[in-house]
Amino acid sequence: MYNSKRIKIALSPIGFVRNGFYVPCGEPSPFRNKPSKIIVFPKYAAGLYRLKEHKYLDIIFCFHRSKGYKLRCKTPHWGVRGVFASRSPYRPSPLGLMKVRLLSIRKNELTVKGLDAFDGTPVVDIKPYVAKWGRKKGVKHHGKTKRSKA
């Protein structure tokens, strides 16, 4: 039987974002068109072995500046929705997920493009994006059905 009072989840960052963005810049975010650095803590650097074989990555990060949440929110493109039907940073578990393009790796420093996160944002995990697992036929994207080539 599930008992939420007994379960505690503790996540530790594996690194952080460096990109010079400190304040929100509107929608669409210009962050996505600028390179960002992900600095991986030295004790995790060996985990980057063979990561450069992947063109795209999924970055899981913490919305560390978000304070509180509402179960319904107004989104810029989709109107009012439940928080789980949105990309809002104001969530019960403040985790973000973005697919980014890997531009380069130098020691423990990744350069990526497409990361919509502030400078100093804690990175919780990095995973290779694998298209055959990421694409789904008939998935709705921004309210429209798109067909996958996978």
List the model feature ranges, each with a label.
Residues 1-150:
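Glycine-rich, low-complexity intrinsically disordered segments
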